[in-house]
Swiss-Prot record:
Domain of life: Eukaryota
Name of the gene encoding the protein in the UniProt record: RPL1
Entry's family note: Belongs to the universal ribosomal protein uL1 family.
MF terms in GO: RNA binding; structural constituent of ribosome
UniProt GO cellular component terms: large ribosomal subunit; mitochondrion
Species assigned in the record: Reclinomonas americana
Name of protein: Large ribosomal subunit protein uL1m
Length: 224
């Protein structure tokens, strides 16, 4: 069901909670969606520039102030011996990539130390399609051992990839019904601010068609 009505974000979340009042599935996800117009610029150069905004955004990850969902699994690619990193789910080098390739393990993130990132180039065809190729923007290429632990802790708290689909849409889960309204609202507002700060004002005004809030099984509300 889709309700094409304009609401402020607070009202939209309250309406979704009311809609799901008698539903026992409290794991239903609250989702925020962004819809961007395909550029109508006649300049090929401008088309490339504007498409680049979303391309760059799609390389980033975002951490919500209020954690929800299952803690992500993290794999570390390294040939070094490291101690005191029991919070890492999988550690290895070529053997680790083999397990990822044959789906023996399915980590949410693959991290690597900066001085070893070159060793992963030959595995780009394996890691790329799975969305596991480490990048600095996603925080999965780590400068040194000193910040490795803090990087793992940040990812474990729930760092979500921003994915832009072929229709120029972004859909991200921002919480579930086990959370209180204030927590959901804080997550939504932090995501809105994050994306707003990474897109030029001129692009948002001309290309951001709508923002909506919905849930796994339920109505959608366009927010203003």
């Amino acid at each position: 069901m889709s309700l094409q009505e304009f609401h402020n974000v607070e009202d939209a979340v309250k309406l979704l909670k009311c809609y799901n009042l008698n539903d026992k599935n409290l794991d239903s996800k609250i989702i925020v969606g962004f819809v961007f117009n395909k550029t109508k610029s006649i300049s090929k150069k401008r088309v490339k520039i504007e498409q680049g905004y979303l391309t760059e955004l799609g390389k980033e990850s975002f951490s919500f102030p209020n954690f929800f969902g299952k803690s992500p699994e993290i794999a570390l690619f390294t040939t070094k011996k490291l101690d005191n990193f029991s919070t890492i789910d999988y550690v290895g080098s070529d053997d680790l990539i083999k397990k990822i390739e044959d789906n023996s393990i399915k980590p949410n993130y693959l991290i690597v130390l900066k001085d070893e990132v070159g060793s992963l180039a030959k595995y780009s065809r394996v890691l790329g399609p799975k969305g596991l190729m480490p990048t600095p923007k996603q925080g999965t290429v780590v400068e040194n051992n000193n910040i490795l632990l803090s990087t793992i802790e940040t990812l474990k708290k729930g760092s979500f990839r921003i994915k832009v689909n072929k229709y120029n849409m972004i859909q991200m889960s921002v919480g579930n019904l086990t959370m209180n309204t204030d927590q959901i609202l804080e997550n939504i507002k932090s995501l809105l601010l994050y994306i707003q700060n990474r897109l030029p004002v001129s692009y948002r005004k001309t290309s951001l068609k709508k923002i909506y809030v919905t849930m796994t099984h339920g109505p959608s509300f366009i927010i203003n």
